Amino acid sequence: MQDEHRTAFLLQTVASELRDVTRLFRMDPALWEETHQPHFIWHAWEGDGRFHCRFALGQEEHHGESHIPACEDARIALLEQKRALKRLCKQTLYDLCKRLTGVTPPWGSLTGIRPTRLVYEAMEHGLSLEAACAQVGEIFDVSPEKRQLLRDIVQVQSTLPPPCEQEMDVYVGIPF
């Protein structure tokens, strides 16, 4: 798949999640409308083996970049690339909004995901609970208080028996 077409395909579902990021900062939804002045302008592309993303609002802009994940299985590679590009776009917009407003949300740039899932993923890659919480906190700009809450929740969950294949989880209340 050509770089430009792959990037366009990967970005098809990210628009609503970008709006979630601006909601963290209580920004006017009209900033996404081209008829509103100023309005968000953004562009994502591939170059030099990396994903790039740029957001601008008025005279302020922010650029981000990340590596393009590779995998031998093309289907898994496409999913990982979509995830990486979406994360890059959300983080780049988050950084711009944080600079524009001076606000730092307690959960940082996390939207639409259970934070414990990210901790478990990091632990599956060999990190300790402390290191995993620190990594999630650094990557997503999570406050120290919320990092501690993450650590406490994962610690409590680790005492519970793992689910069997024929069982499912039911969330009654999520403390996030």
Q: At which residue positions do the language-model features occur?
A:
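Conserved, surface-exposed functional patches that form binding/active-site neighborhoods
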Residues: 85-105
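Generic structural signal for hydrophobic residues
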Residues: 18-22, 93, 132
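Short, charged N-terminal beta->alpha structural module
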Residues: 1-28, 143
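Local cysteine-cluster metal-coordination motifs and their immediate loop/turn environment
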Residues: 109, 114, 171-176
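Short gly/ser-rich anion-binding loops that grip negatively charged ligand groups
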Residues: 79, 83, 87, 109, ...
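Short, well-ordered secondary-structure micro-motifs within conserved domains or adaptor modules
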Residues: 2, 22-81, 86-89
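N-terminal [4Fe-4S]-dependent radical SAM core
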Residues: 97-104, 124-171
